Amino acid sequence: MSFFAGKLNNKSILSLRRGSGGDTNQHINPDSQTIFHSDMSHVIITETHSTGLRLDQGAGDYYWSEMPSRVTQLHNNDPNRVVLTEIEFSDGSRHMLSGMSMGVGAKAYGIINPQIMSQGGLKTQITASADLSLDVGYFNTGTSGTIPQKLRDGTGCQHMFGAFSGRRGFASSAMYLGGAALYKSAWSGSGYVVADAGTLTIPSDYVRHPGARNFGFNAIYVRGRSCNRVLYGMEGPNYTTGGAVQGASSSGALNFTYNPSNPESPKYSVGFARADPTNYAYWESMGDPNDSANGPIGIYSEHLGIYPSKITWYVTNLVYNGSGYNIDGGLFNGNDIKLSPREFIIKGVNVNNTSWKFINFIEKNFNVGNRADFRDVGCNLSKDSPSTGISGIATFGLPTTESNNAPSIKGGNVGGLHANVVSIYNFLPSASWYVSSNPPKIGNNYGDVWSENLLPLRLLGGSGSTILSGNIVFQGNGSVHVGTVGLDLNSSRNGAIVCTMEFIDDTWLSAGGIGCFNPTEMLSQGAEYGDSRFRIGGNTINKKLHQILSLPAGEYVPFFTIKGTVVNACKLQAAAYNPTPYWVSGLPGSVGQTGYYTLTYYMRNDGNNNISIWLDSSMSNIIGMKACLPNIKLIIQRLT
């Protein structure tokens, strides 16, 4: 029999299982065929908080709101609590935040004969978002200025790194020395770079990760766009004589340094700052950003065709413990069991009168329809291969559900995607209940609530984890396997998981591909192996992103994407940086040799009880893509 309500082995049980027939005793304990069981550690929503978004004058397209006080308290003081964040848009569609994205721009610039005249340098700018497809971040309303200016000290900032030498002879040497000071290593035995005592180390608390929890943020912003991709023109960082970058956060750092053992050696400056995400003039001479030869910079993000209007936070009873998850408090601790048209009591809890909400896993291609008690929310994408299918500029659409609960995808240019949803079930006092054994289901006058297609999430089995760390070099477009998590997933069915991306340190900034490595290190000079990342000191900031994901069997779910642009730049026609930056194929030549790339991390339900992790590289006009894995501890536990 597929349904039981009563007592077995002297304990109260309500149980719904797949199949029909069989011994009543199979309901005593839940197993892999269980749909609902009153003894299971079900995942529920204990609190719901909502606020509308507004758009201030001068805020561009940065919609924002202060977070409710309870959400602010959880965000800053309870970083292990799994809180789901839903964004509702002007057309009624909905999206649940998941994953992370970065935008990276990098440039090396100089002239064909740097021993004679002009400038040289290198520069990187990084933005990041607390969602794979949408630009989302946190800030403090107490910061001065407009909303974009407030983001200089929030997670919506741009992190700016640069090394620069002015109009003087032998600028080439200064470029090399500046690169050595800014990055962790320089060429080995190349004859160009020597060890230098002047180095720039960025303190960890200068960095604003999208999952940062220690800065007292009390507000959130959302754009109807993807995370910024930074497109560079030809000029270089323009430092002021006062030793600070104009328009940047006061928390920035700027070092003017040189080789102290040789005062006559070429001088150079090395800098870091956080800045407004919408105004990049402070490190560039401004002009037409669409002029590839002389334009200073472009800020490009893909509009998804919708505008955010409301945010809802769902506080769950799931708590991350560093190696897995716990359920906070018991759900059903009484004895009474009753299921009748007007009453639904599970071990003393009358669910019709509770404020709890259950979270259901919905099978792929199943739609509950437009119902008052179900609120489906698009949570993640999936596809048949770990590849964007796009060379260079790839953008993932936004998984949403429409106001009638139908799944959809907004914007993007990556094809072959499926939108997956999580379903929020709200018990209504007006519900009239029924139960069926064949097929097994519990429902009410609004429709089925729990069935083989509608599984209430519950914490199952042990957790699994892997750490994504190290260097990878791609010689062309392709995907590589970077990790496996064993979870004892049911091999024949789709599943749902809870997943935490815990960033062990701030080397995630170096995960931005070639844009985050020293551009004066050519591939032929050993850049395949050299550790040439930014120096970040300390790890004082808690950085976690929690999400619930749907994993269709055999499909790949993107959870972290990096969009990059690199430019080999010079202001003079028919001149180029010398030597050639390591990402460029060939000798110096044309102005503005620009390359584009997208790095994407996927997880796959392998159908053999494992989840595999993949990294895909998509490049255009780039050779030798060098990537640093972001030093993420990825913790996953089954919910179905």
UniProtKB/Swiss-Prot annotation:
Region (Interaction with host FhuA) residue spans: 571-580
An individual GO BP term: receptor-mediated virion attachment to host cell
Major localization class: virion
Site (Interaction with host FhuA receptor): G166
Keyword vocabulary terms for this entry: Host-virus interaction, Late protein, Viral attachment to host cell, Viral attachment to host entry receptor, Viral tail protein, Virion, Virus entry into host cell
GO CC aspect terms: virus tail
Highest taxon in the source lineage: Viruses
Compartments reported by the entry: Virion
Cysteine disulfide links: none
Assembly, per entry: Monomer. Interacts with straight fiber protein pb4. Interacts with the host FhuA receptor; this interaction is necessary for the entry of the viral genome into the host cell.
Further facts: Only small regions of the protein may be involved in protein-protein interactions in the tail structure, the major part being used in receptor binding.
Task of the protein: Structural component of the distal part of the tail. Mediates T5 irreversible binding to its host entry receptor, the E.coli outer membrane ferrichrome transporter FhuA protein. Upon binding to host FhuA, pb5 undergoes conformational changes that are probably the key to the transmission of the signal through the tail to the capsid, triggering DNA release.
UniProt-recorded name of the protein: Receptor-binding protein pb5
Native organism: Escherichia phage T5 (Enterobacteria phage T5)
The encoding gene: oad
